[in-house]
Design a protein with these regions (language model features):
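Polytopic transmembrane helical bundles with strong interfacial aromatic enrichment
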Residues: 1-189
Length: 189
């Protein structure tokens, strides 16, 4: 099983190289000018980031299984049940965190961080007018979710706030459960 997993991780790493080349190639299709620097496609940048996230997650998961396999036989039934519950409770937060990271690819790809580099407001607005326009008619403006500078920046910020709240929720759940010391430490990080 480990050999198959490592082979899969190697294949992911190799494909990451090809995706990186594909991403960079998108920035070289149009020559740079004084007014327009070289930029890569936000879609390709986010694909490259997603593959890196998948590869990192796979390597981390594999390493954790090798270094610290969890043995439910050495803990009470209540601790084992609480550990399984906490793992399930943490999944939505993990998904939100990953979506937040991937939305950062669109922020970087659209260079939205340079346009809206104030906090907590976005320049002078809590919600820029372009965001309201996009969400009021999403059927016609759906591409703005990925290509509009104010929209990708606003979405990334809202996802980041949601990530923080979900992390606090997992922390609150973990504090109230009987867990192994290692599991408690991991949950409270």
């Amino acid at each position: 099983a480990l050999c198959a997993r490592l082979t899969g991780l190697f294949a992911l790493g190799a494909s990451q190289g090809f995706i990186g080349w594909w991403m960079v190639k998108s920035g070289l299709e149009e020559p740079a000018t004084k007014d327009r620097p070289i930029t890569v496609s936000p879609y390709r940048l986010t694909t490259h980031l997603a593959m890196a996230l998948a590869l990192y997650s796979g390597v981390l998961w594999t390493a954790m299984n090798i270094l610290r396999p969890y043995d439910f036989l050495n803990v009470s039934t209540a601790v084992a049940k609480n550990t399984r519950f906490l793992k399930k409770a943490a999944i939505p937060g993990l998904v939100i965190s990953m979506i937040t990271v991937l939305s950062g690819g669109f922020v970087a790809g659209n260079q939205a961080g340079f346009a809206y580099n104030t906090w907590p407001k976005m320049l002078d607005d809590w919600v820029p007018p372009e965001v309201i326009t996009t969400y009021s008619n999403l059927r016609e403006n759906y591409k703005n979710l990925f290509m509009s500078t104010p929209v990708v920046q606003f979405d990334h910020r809202m996802l980041a706030y949601t990530t923080v709240l979900s992390s606090w929720a997992v922390y609150g759940i973990a504090r109230g459960l009987e867990l192994t010391p290692a599991c408690r430490k991991a949950a409270l990080l």
